Each structure stands twice: as C-alpha cells, then as structure tokens.
Amino acid sequence: MTQSNPNEQSVELNRTSLYWGLLLIFVLAVLFSNYFFN
C-alpha cells in the first residue's frame, strides 16, 4: 500500500495534461472559427 502515493501523483499529472489538452483544443477552435468568419 506504500505505492499508492506515486499512483495518485500520476493520476493528477494525467488530469493536468488532459486539462491542458482541452484548453489547447479550445484555443485552436477559436482561431479556426476566426479564420472561417474572416
């Protein structure tokens, strides 16, 4: 049960990377929408 801490850290890292990925996709979507509207 001593290896539960590294697992939790890896889960937190995956969540942060997932949030950054969603943010990047959102920014790209906004840029593409601006190109389409222009």
UniProtKB/Swiss-Prot annotation:
GO cellular component terms attached to this protein's record: chloroplast thylakoid; chloroplast thylakoid membrane; photosystem II reaction center; thylakoid
Main subcellular location of this protein, as a coarse class: plastid
Taxonomic superkingdom: Eukaryota
Pfam families per the UniProt record, alphabetical: PsbL
Subcellular localization(s) per the UniProt record: Plastid, Chloroplast thylakoid membrane
Family: Belongs to the PsbL family.
Name this polypeptide is given: Photosystem II reaction center protein L
Species of provenance: Arabidopsis thaliana (Mouse-ear cress)
Species classification: Eukaryota, Viridiplantae, Streptophyta, Embryophyta, Tracheophyta
Gene: psbL
